[in-house]
Design a protein with these regions (language model features):
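Short glycine/serine/threonine-rich phosphate/pyrophosphate-binding segments
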Residues: 1-4, 13, 20-28, 37-38, ...
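Conserved phosphate-binding catalytic cores of ATP/NTP-utilizing and phosphoryl-transfer enzymes
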Residues: 1-18, 183-187, 191
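Phosphate/ATP-binding catalytic cores across multiple sugar-kinase/actin-like superfamilies
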Residues: 8, 112-139, 185-189
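A short acidic Gly-Thr/Ser loop motif
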Residues: 10, 17-24, 30-34, 44-46, ...
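Phosphate-binding glycine-rich/basic clefts of nucleotide- and phosphate-handling proteins
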Residues: 31-114, 139
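Short, surface-exposed connector motifs at secondary-structure boundaries
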Residues: 34-36, 137-142, 164-167
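Glycine-rich phosphate-binding loops at beta-strand->alpha-helix junctions
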Residues: 77, 81, 136-160
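Conserved phosphate-binding/catalytic loops in two-lobed NTP-binding clefts
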Residues: 158-183, 192-197
Length: 197
C-alpha cells in the first residue's frame, strides 16, 4: 500500500501507513525499504459490517443481510459525531418473521461501529508507541496515511488524529493503493527486492 500511494520507502525517513481492508487492519512504520514496527488486527471493514448486523438484531430485533449492513455503513456510517441523518432499513422482524421497515439515525450506526473503530485506533497507538524516536519525529511531521476501503468511513481520519495528536491523511485513491503498489513492485523487482525478503 505504501508503494502504491507513492511513498519513497527507500529513504531514511519514517512513514506510517494504516491499511484498513476487509478482513484485517495493518499498520506499519516503514523506513529504508523495511518495516520497523507493525501491528495487524483482524478488525476491519467486514467486522464493521458484522457489528451493524448484530446491532440490528439486538437493538431492533431485525434481521438484515451483510449486503444491507455494508450499504448502511457506506451511506451513514461514521467514526465520529456528524450531522445526524435518518435512513430506512428493511429486514425481517425476528419476533413475527414478517418483513418490516424501520427508521434509524446515523448516531445509532456510529454506536454500532464504536468497538471496531476503537480497536483500530488503539492498534495505531500501539504501533506509534513502538516507533523509535528518530522516526517518530518524521511521522509527526509527515503524518499518518490511511488507505484501504475502511479509510472511507466518515471521520476515521479525524478520530485517529484526535486520539494520537498526529496529522492524518487519507490516501488519494485508497481502494487501489495495494493493487497499484503490487503492480509497481512487479514492474521493478530489482528496485524493490529488499522489500520482498
Amino acid at each position: 500500500a505504501a508503494i502504491g500511494i507513492g511513498l519513497d520507502i527507500s529513504q531514511p525517513i519514517g512513514n506510517i501507513i494504516v491499511d484498513i481492508g476487509g478482513g484485517t487492519t495493518e499498520i506499519a512504520v516503514i523506513s529504508l525499504n523495511g518495516v520497523v514496527t507493525k501491528e495487524t488486527i483482524r478488525i476491519a471493514g467486514d467486522e464493521m459490517d458484522e457489528c451493524i448486523l448484530q446491532w440490528f438484531r439486538n437493538e431492533h430485533k431485525l434481521e438484515i443481510g451483510l449486503g444491507m449492513s455494508e450499504s448502511i455503513k457506506k451511506s451513514v456510517g461514521s467514526a465520529m459525531q456528524m450531522n445526524s441523518k435518518e435512513i430506512s432499513v428493511r429486514g425481517r422482524d425476528l419476533v413475527t418473521g414478517i418483513p418490516k421497515t424501520i427508521e434509524v439515525s446515523s448516531d445509532e450506526i456510529r454506536q454500532a461501529l464504536k468497538d471496531p473503530v476503537n480497536a483500530i485506533v488503539e492498534a495505531v497507538k500501539r504501533c506509534l508507541e513502538q516507533t523509535p524516536p528518530e522516526l517518530a519525529a518524521d511521522i509527526l511531521e509527515r503524518g499518518i496515511i490511511v488507505a484501504g476501503g475502511g479509510s472511507l468511513l466518515k471521520g476515521i481520519d479525524q478520530i485517529i488524529r484526535e486520539r494520537t495528536n498526529v496529522p492524518v491523511n487519507v490516501a488519494e485513491d485508497p481502494l487501489l493503493s495495494v493493487v497499484r503498489g503490487t503492480g509497481m513492485v512487479l514492474e521493478n523487482l530489482k528496485k524493490y527486492e529488499a522489500v520482498l525478503l
